[in-house]
């Protein structure tokens, strides 16, 4: 299990804590993550063996820099899609373009954007805090365009470990890295800089937890078992999560309660409530979807009808539209991908798995193309890179008068 420090995350932490406490391999179980977890893991799992892998390169604070003065191979970090787009537009005009990384992108689109950056087609990466996990790139400098983020409740300053997770993307293996700020973020105070440069962060003393030994006798018993108190002081019961809120909403429907008349159907109700809200539009819309899915699974042949899924999927196959439209379609397709991968919800699950995968791939490719078209000026990028390398530019004039510089069209000669 990677990124085990996410046990302390308020939203997802209980999932990681459950794996820490209960997931075990046949021969070995390995948890990877920050050293801040060491004391509490030792307390929870006294027999655990710890192996440390120190960072080989140095991380140094480089202060504030204007966007136009950021070095090549920089990642610029903001915390909203609006800010990411605005920064990417500026970099496109000034430096020829940038790759874009956000949590809303599908893995296929994200990998294509990373490949664009890694290949040197662009020298800048604009990202949300999604850059902090699961991506290894040749980044020399990380610039924070903001030091605050919206966490679903309100705006707050980034915690030291959050800053460290992102700043640590700079440098790789034995190559040193730098971090700093840009735009209106302002400087990082000296105390915080010292923590980040020396990788000194407070230990995690409490982990988020939820009971996973659930009771399925009745829906009410299930809800009560979800709210069971934590067994230790260093485990903190999570506040309402999406799935438990969905359960409460569906339990308010008398027909749903009547259908959940046995432990098997209560378990099925809980499985439906666990469908993630990938689209994150309105909670009511997601709850209506869950309600409909459970009604299908609890009546008739107990399967989700193929024609119903087909109607929904047919609205998502279009690859036109702007960046947000394409990203929205991908998020909706993920819901159907999740449903199609449940073992006994569909008559022809394999068919729908292939269909949803094909649609997501097509939308992901279209989204990558849209991001590249909007945020990469290939002509400017090629010329800027050639000038930075201080080499002579290769220019040519074609037979019909087109002027090409480094293979890029720059104009046409007339009358010569």
Enumerate the predicted regions with their spans:
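Conserved motor-coupling elements within RecA-like helicase/translocase cores
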Residues: 66, 107-125
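Post-DEXD/H (motif II) to motif III coupling segment of the RecA-like Helicase ATP-binding lobe
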Residues: 4-61, 171
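Conserved two-lobed SF2 helicase motor
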Residues: 1, 117-136
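C-terminal helicase lobe
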Residues: 60-77, 161-251
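Extended, charged helical/alpha-beta scaffold domains that provide interaction surfaces
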Residues: 249, 257-416
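Conserved strand-helix element at the start of the C-terminal RecA-like helicase core
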Residues: 29-32, 38, 69-94, 98-102, ...
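Conserved helicase motor
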Residues: 58, 79-82, 100-112, 128-133
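Conserved segment of the helicase C-terminal RecA-like domain
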Residues: 25-39, 119-124, 137-201
